[in-house]
């Protein structure tokens, strides 16, 4: 069976695989969009958030490939400044190596129809140090923006058997994060993992809540930085 893609479209499938859902994060710490101006949401025209994303320049959003696979992009818009501004999508693409079963290469780009004057964040090109602290910014069940503190776990360690995953599951385009708060759970796919003020990961999948020995699995952004750079130029 396919892994969990923390996505509301797949809640029925996800219930069979994991207890992470897109109902919203639990256990996060309240934050503000001014602290994370680069965080955006992919949402329906009714305002319902389906995925997170992050601005890497004034018109380009990085998000998870699953978000463009499981939703009709023509029916999505991008919420900027925590939804205060809604921008149409001009074009989009996802990594051609994205695999529905393994969740390998779970990364995509969205080009906005107009530039936005908010903060952006740099894409990390070097692997984060194992054990470094990071933060996931996402929304809780009440639609409040929250931070979830994470301890970053590298690819080889996460798949070593010390946690819930085998080396066959944690592939080279993935890294993991263990929630610092034992009660933290859930996040929208595509929500950014930031460490050292750079984008190092995107929420992708997991078998648990990212805690109690069950790390959340993220798209490993440094391993896909070249694809992001080249694709953003041609999008």
Predicted features, each with a name:
Residues 92, 107, 112-113, 118-180, ...:
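Chymotrypsin/trypsin-fold serine protease catalytic domain
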């Amino acid at each position: 069976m396919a892994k969990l893609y923390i996505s509301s479209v797949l809640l029925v499938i996800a219930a069979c695989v994991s207890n992470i859902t897109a109902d919203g994060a639990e256990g996060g710490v309240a934050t503000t969009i001014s602290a994370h101006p680069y965080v955006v949401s992919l949402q329906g025209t009714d305002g319902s958030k389906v995925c997170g994303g992050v601005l890497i320049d004034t018109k380009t959003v990085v998000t998870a490939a699953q978000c463009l696979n499981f939703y009709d992009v023509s029916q999505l818009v991008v919420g900027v400044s925590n939804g205060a501004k809604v921008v149409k999508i001009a074009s989009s693409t996802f990594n051609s190596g994205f695999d529905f079963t393994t969740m390998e290469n779970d990364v995509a780009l969205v080009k906005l129809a107009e530039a936005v004057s908010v903060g952006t964040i740099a894409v990390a090109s070097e692997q984060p140090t194992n054990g470094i602290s990071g933060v996931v910014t996402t929304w809780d069940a009440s639609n409040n923006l929250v931070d979830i503190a994470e301890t970053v776990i590298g690819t080889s360690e996460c798949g070593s058997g010390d946690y819930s995953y085998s080396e066959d599951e944690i592939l080279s385009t993935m890294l993991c994060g263990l929630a610092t708060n034992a009660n933290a759970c859930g996040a929208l796919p595509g929500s950014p993992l930031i460490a050292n003020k750079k984008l190092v990961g995107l929420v992708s999948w997991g078998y648990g809540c990212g805690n109690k020995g069950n790390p959340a699995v993220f798209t490993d952004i440094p391993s896909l930085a070249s694809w992001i750079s080249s694709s953003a130029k041609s999008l």
